[in-house]
Amino acid sequence: MNLRVLVDNNTYIDRYFIGEPALSFFIEDREKRILFDTGYSHAFIHNAEKMRINLRKLHYIALSHGHIDHTWGLTDLVRLFMEAKGEKIDHTIPTVIGHPLVFNSKLFPSEGEIGSLLSEEKVNYHFPVHLSREPFWLTEKLVFLGEVDRKFDFEEDEPIGSVIIEEQYEDDYVVDDTALVYKAKEGLVVIVGCAHSGLCNIIEQAKMVCEEERVISVIGGFHLLNPSKNRIEKTVSYLEKLELQSLYPCHCTDLQSKIALARTGIVKEVGVGLNIEWK
């Protein structure tokens, strides 16, 4: 499997890509091409073109959850495919994969809508949509986890605004947050978007779904923005016990958390343009 970072908060020196506080990864495995999240704007398309990645040939668009920094680029992706149809440019019709609540409206008092700008219905006009709480295998080795069980008390979080479910406002604990997992030869690679479900919870879910205890790498947003001392210490302790080969914290992982995670001795730099391969 090959993974390239299309969008992150950071870009590399002398790599002239666009960064934004968002996330988007391009993944290739066994001739399948997957876009994991779409960032906040058109930046992922701009960066993909500079990397010579043809996003018109996707098989899946997998969404980690519904927040703006992971779904608002969908509008630009729809436009890309509309223009391909109009100009008769060769393209596929990818399937959108997500949790059943990924397109529900999410509201925050000071900002208004912080969920997807497009409803499931509107997305379905352009791409087939498959929403599932259960795991869904994208390839023989790459799985969309579905809804994540939240086991660890230290990863409990406050709600982020509200979510509208069946016309009712409910506290939003972002239960739509999920991840992808790749079954490499030496163990699991866990690919997270924002880890609202809790990084350790997600890894435990990955081990259960894949029936594999070995975990070799984790990449993505770890949802460690000003975490409590208890949370960061227990997270680091959990990760140390996994005996990982590499750790790629990015997006919603603040500097102090990265410094704490560096105790593992395996933290790697992440930025737009990063290209990683696992076998």
Which sequence ranges carry the predicted segments?
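Conserved beta-strand hairpin/beta-sheet module of binuclear metal-dependent hydrolase folds
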Residues: 1-51, 173, 177-192
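Active-site metal-binding loops of divalent metal-dependent hydrolases
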Residues: 8-10, 38-41, 66, 100-102, ...
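Cap/insert and terminal regions of metallo-dependent hydrolase folds
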Residues: 60, 66-73, 173-179, 183-271
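Active-site neighborhood of divalent metal-dependent phosphoester bond hydrolases
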Residues: 100-125
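Active-site-proximal loop/helix segment associated with metal-binding centers of metalloenzymes
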Residues: 110-114, 134-186
